[in-house]
Amino acid sequence: MRSLVLAVLAVVPSTLVLSMPAAADCAAITKALTGIVTDLTCLESTDLTTRNDATTPPDNSRPGLPPNAFTPRTDAQAVSPDAPFRTAIDPSRTFPGLQITGAMADDANARWLLRLPAAANWNHKLVVGVPGGFRSEFMGDFIFSDLVVQQGFAYVSTNKGMLNFFFTAAGADPLACRLSPRVAATGAAFTHFYANDAGNSIREWFRRTLEATDVAELAIDAHYDRAPERVYLMGISNGGHVVRRLLAEAPTRFDGGLDWEGVFWSTGGPNILIDLPVALRNWDGYVTSGLSATSPASLAIRAAGYPPDIRATPPTPANTFSPLVGSLWETHANNYWDVTTCVFVRLVDPLYPVDQLDPLAASDTKDYDYLARRKPFHLSPRVGQVATDGDIARRLITVQGTMDTLLPIVHHGRAFRDAVVTAGRASLHRYYEVQNGNHIERYRQTCCNFVQLELIQPHAHRAFQLLLDWVERGVSPPASQCIPRGGAIVSDPAAAARPERCASLLVE
């Protein structure tokens, strides 16, 4: 009966099927994971890439959760370029295998996803994808999974132990965080991020990533009857931070990693709780100035490390929290600056009395002063537990764009590179700056039309291939370099007169 059903499924368009349980294989995997995971689903897929619509579940498809808590398709699209610049999928092949999902036994919201290629296609290696923000385990479906599944890797990802967010009422929810600055059209909207719930922490991200790796290795052994020969990490933003930490504190588990625009944390700075409040304190003044580049507010934001503001061509009225997308700073302020500050203040400094309802309370996100609170409120030990000191013990390639307007490159990518050099680990690290690259790929395209921006994904994917050659063939990757607009990583940056760091954050 199983073979008959599969024969029928073979002629059904892949957009319709994630298929059916593969009884024998799934039974072995279920047995191997007994007592470790819960809510396990194991299905045979005709194609593990996103060409199969069933690969990434619909948004809000987990019963019992509020809207926005679980949004796999939104998560995958948020960090990926739009077509036609998405990861290319070979039209001449399909990529069958098992798709397995579940949660850790101690927390039903600590979710993971595992994709196991058909045995004939598996290359005996595993990639661990770590999402950015607080997004789901499906966030890397376009940017990570589609790349590595086609190469025969098994792929596992985790939501780092927590769901995303839901909209809430500020007065009734003590953990509410305003979505956008007060002057924005969405300044009255409030969110509740699961990261701020009791028991959740940044440290949990590291533990849950290691647990997802454990799950994958157990399932791989049960399915293929052998352990993976190599295990690699790939992470973006908060996920890049996790990659950096794990290559320092758990290096025996991994062979190397790709860090795409990871967050830098240091007890004495820089860190996002120093940068973001400065931008927020000056935001109203910048708006009042008519978004003038020469206003004192603009100069103060630039002095905090942020790249220059740019304008969309043409402005777009949709697909954003901004009523009109005309300014890159405005788009980041309304989507990220305010809410990110609030969430991380609650994570790192829970004694800070966040008050976003009373303009006179002087305890809003823009009022936060990390350096003034660091010693009195003992923040150094808390930040030290998640800091990225550069003491990596496995090969790592970092890629970041110079126009990153959420994590300014001068305080994140460059600061981490400096930390690696100071730690004496430069031989294990390569650092590639993408001229005009931004934190959000889609902002270059029809979402927002910031045509001055460059995509980072092609360089991140190239960096992963360089990492594989470095680890498996001993081929040293090209030296750290600035990748110019329209360019690529070159083997001899000195001969090409390329510095390690781009001379300007913006090249028009």
Annotate each language-model stretch with its function.
Residues M1-L4:
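Positively charged n-region of N-terminal signal peptides that target proteins for export
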Residues L6-V17:
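Bacterial N-terminal signal peptides
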Residues L18-A24:
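Sec/Tat signal peptide C-region and signal peptidase I cleavage site
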Residues A24-E508:
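C-terminal His-loop and adjacent cap/lid subdomain of alpha/beta-hydrolase
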